[in-house]
Amino acid sequence: MNRAADDLIASHLARSHAAMARAAQDTALLASAGRIAAKIVTALRSGRKLLIVGNGGSAADAQHIAAEIVGRYKQERPAFAAIALTTDTSALTAIGNDYGFDHVFARQVEGLGTSGDVLLAISTSGRSPSILNALRKARERGLTTIGFTGANGLAMGELCDELLVAPSDDTPLIQQIHLATAHGICETIEAALMQDLS
């Protein structure tokens, strides 16, 4: 690689490190993450499930989080119920074709979500229509609603029982904070549910 590429990568890593350091000191984010973990634990203990939605990079995060919950994060333990609503290409394309892309997640929440479940909605901007519609439908159906967003996505909070705000307005950094925080939440969930088994 040439020096310019090295400098770009080093600059990104430095910005990422600074953003993570801010997040680690953000008392509002940490408190919100703890409450989110507790809400998900309550649902899973009751035999309910976690539904997760997001677009683009946030869709990848949705799948990653679901995999940590259904598979395992660190400890060998029973599977817990989590579904990323970003993975069924037939449902996504049928709903998108028949109802419009803005409804690809809301329609799945309507079909799969039941009272007591949790919807985790990830949107770096907090303004994605497909995400906001999913949150509205979840509220109608009695799901607990959780949002992950960035510094400019606070309006999304009106539809969320709990909102985690990454302290950045830069999309890649927001995504990195979301995933790192989600890992902490998964570890907290796993530890709490493993205590039930001991």
UniProtKB/Swiss-Prot annotation:
Substrate binds at N55, G56, G57, E68, N97, D98, S123, T124, S125, S128, Q175. It is found in: Cytoplasm. Zn(2+) binds at H64, E68, Q175, H183. Its cofactor is Zn(2+). It catalyses: 2 D-sedoheptulose 7-phosphate = D-glycero-alpha-D-manno-heptose 7-phosphate + D-glycero-beta-D-manno-heptose 7-phosphate. Its EC number is 5.3.1.28. Binds 1 zinc ion per subunit. PROSITE patterns: SIS. It is an enzyme of class 5 (isomerase). InterPro entries: GmhA/DiaA (IPR035461), Phosphoheptose_Isoase (IPR004515), SIS_dom (IPR001347), SIS_dom_sf (IPR046348), SIS_GmhA/DiaA_subfam (IPR050099). Residues 40-198 form the SIS domain. The keyword Chaperone does not apply. GO terms for molecular function: carbohydrate derivative binding; D-sedoheptulose 7-phosphate isomerase activity; zinc ion binding. Homotetramer. The reaction produces a racemic mixture of D-glycero-alpha-D-manno-heptose 7-phosphate and D-glycero-beta-D-manno-heptose 7-phosphate. Catalyzes the isomerization of sedoheptulose 7-phosphate in D-glycero-D-manno-heptose 7-phosphate. This is Phosphoheptose isomerase. It comes from Bradyrhizobium sp. (strain BTAi1 / ATCC BAA-1182).
